[in-house]
Regions:
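C-terminal target-recognition/interaction regions appended to catalytic cores
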Residues: 240-373
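Short, solvent-exposed loop/turn segments at secondary-structure junctions
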Residues: 13, 34, 93-95, 135-136, ...
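Redox-cofactor binding/interface segments in oxidoreductases and associated redox assembly factors
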Residues: 90, 131, 306
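Core alpha/beta nucleotide-donor-binding catalytic domains of modification enzymes
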Residues: 2-125, 135-148
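Class I S-adenosyl-L-methionine
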Residues: 70-84, 95, 99-286
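Short, conserved catalytic/metal-binding motifs centered on acidic residues
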Residues: 88, 182, 352
Length: 373
């Protein structure tokens, strides 16, 4: 089978990379932010990945639903004529559904983009789609109504769906990051593949879609691991990983694996104008506050969200995390880099916004297994 992926809200391309390295072909990339799109182009060049067949579209997804509708429709139609399985993947900006964000829901500018993405899927009818967003969209009562309405719209347009609240830790990412993943397959594709589904059930039965096949750890294994809590902050200190810890889920394991000290983005971090003593007063592993969370070297990171004044401190250095360290926490390959001329604000925003690479890779493998089993 040939898989052609149209990527939306692409950012730095973490989600796309997980699909691409699983044998999917990224043919179209849409991103509104010019700086983020430059990161995407730079990383592809460094990783020596071929350019998307239909190139890059810099602009709002809303244009593709309105005045540029024919442009996108022709591209999708071309891949369908070639008998490709066409996939739409994307994670619309999510502050409006986040408890830590603005929580405006569908009324917020970012919230509206989720609805626009669903409308685009219904308009173009790809073979399958992936929708990624924050837990709040699925868990919060007032947002859940909007989420359920989106699903109903998709079901009416011929999609059969499956969903799961994932934690990136399950896929081997050193980061506690919960996200709702909604995946849908058009009934035409499932008929073509001889899937027999109950016409009255718009959801794929839980025992049919292998959500856990490509996870690395169960939630129970993660909870039973003896991760340390806090230690005194000792600058430039070193000590081995304690027994009973899932080492490959720890910050220090990934710092070492990605050789973050020698990474091209190693020297990119915010330097405070004042308050250095505060950087030294917070215990290693104390991530209890809204801001100034100090990571523990032998534990996983809290969610890599570096906006809204959220400051994450290095476990054993008196400074904030570097871009290289943030990339490691997002489980990117050590060869993945950002252009060094990007602003620090944009660098941390695009890294924090991304879907962790290993989670993306696992989900991409799961979809492929479902379609090819």
């Amino acid at each position: 089978m040939k898989y052609s992926i149209f990527s939306f809200f692409s950012g730095a391309g973490f989600l796309d990379l997980g699909f691409e390295l699983n044998g999917y072909d990224i043919v179209f990339v849409n991103e509104f932010n010019k700086s983020f799109l430059n990161v995407y182009k730079h990383s592809r060049k460094v990783l020596q990945l071929k350019q998307p067949q239909f190139g890059y579209h810099e602009g709002s997804i809303e244009c593709l639903l309105k005045n540029e509708k024919d442009f996108l429709s022709k591209l999708v139609a071309q891949k369908k004529i070639e008998q490709d399985i066409v996939g739409f993947i994307g994670g619309p900006p999510c502050p409006d559904f986040s408890v830590g964000g603005k929580n405006r829901g569908i009324e917020g500018e970012n919230g509206k983009l989720s609805n626009t993405y669903i409308e685009l899927i219904c308009q173009e009818k790809p073979s399958f789609f992936l929708f990624e967003n924050v837990k709040g969209l699925w868990k919060t009562k007032k947002h859940r109504l909007f989420y359920d309405d989106m699903k109903k719209k998709l079901h009416k347009n011929g999609y059969v769906t499956t969903e799961r609240l994932i934690n990136s830790l399950e896929y081997g990412v050193p980061q506690h990051r919960e996200r709702i993943i909604l995946i849908g397959f058009h009934e035409d594709l499932l008929t073509r593949l001889s899937y027999k589904l109950d016409e009255d059930l718009p959801d794929i039965p839980s025992d049919m879609f292998p959500w856990e096949k490509y996870t690395k750890y169960t939630k129970e294994e993660i909870l039973s691991s003896s991760f340390p809590t806090t230690n005194d902050f000792n600058e430039e200190s070193s000590y081995p990983c304690p027994n009973g810890v899932l080492k490959d889920l720890t910050v220090e394991y990934w710092f070492q694996q990605n050789d973050v000290s020698n990474h091209p983005n190693a020297e990119q971090y915010f330097v405070p104008r004042q308050g250095l003593m505060k950087f030294k007063s917070i215990e290693e592993g104390d991530d209890s506050k809204k801001s100034y969370k100090r990571l523990h070297r032998w534990r996983y990171s809290p969610t890599a969200a570096y906006g809204n004044n959220e400051v994450h401190l290095h476990p054993y250095k008196a400074r904030r995390l570097s871009v290289a360290e943030a990339l490691a926490i997002q489980s990117l390959p050590k060869t993945f880099e950002l252009p060094t001329d990007i602003s620090l604000t944009d660098a941390f925003r695009t890294v924090g916004n991304g879907v962790p690479y290993l989670a993306s890779k696992g989900i991409a493998a799961t979809i492929k297994h479902f379609l090819e089993q």
